[in-house]
Amino acid sequence: FFYFKSLCDVYKNITIKPDYPKHTSIKELELKIEEGIALGYSHIFCVIDMDTKDTEPERTQYQKLRAKYAKPIAKRKKGIYCNVEFFETHRCTELFFLYYFRYTSRAYENQESLLKDLNKSAAYQKTTDFFIKSKGLHNYFERNGGSLEKAVANANRSVEEKMKSDRDYTYSELGRLMERLESI
């Protein structure tokens, strides 16, 4: 949430929902998607941390949700046409933050080991206080020598390598998300 809010200067014509950070269940996510469709949003982008989808029943519930929204939602009588897209990162969004600085395909056993690597490039704490003090995570990472362009390139590389090797860890589709935001 805080990271995407910090991108509003880069992508001026986007609306970020929800307005607060929240770990959302699949059922809650589905309700939020339906709410966005009813509000007439043309695009709904769902950012998914896959570390919470590694086990059942979450994995199956998530796959069903993706399948449900695989095609655009069209309700012509209501004037609704909405594309719902999912963008995954395994383990978590902080991998994309690390990609601001360097590439890795290392298998992380847990979030703490990933955060330790991120902290080698820029001090980072997963706290509301830190997010506020950083005055925007995107700018904070760039002030500390990272770059969004590098993050996008590294994320795209991780997805390409994932597909070639059939691995199911350490990848981020957030590069593709940034490219989609750029195209809107």
Regions found by a protein language model. Give the residues of each.
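C-terminal accessory helical subdomains adjacent to catalytic cores in phosphodiester-
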Residues: K5-Y20, I26, E30-H43, D51-I184
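Short N-terminal binding/cap micro-motifs at the start of the first secondary-structure element
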Residues: F1-Y3
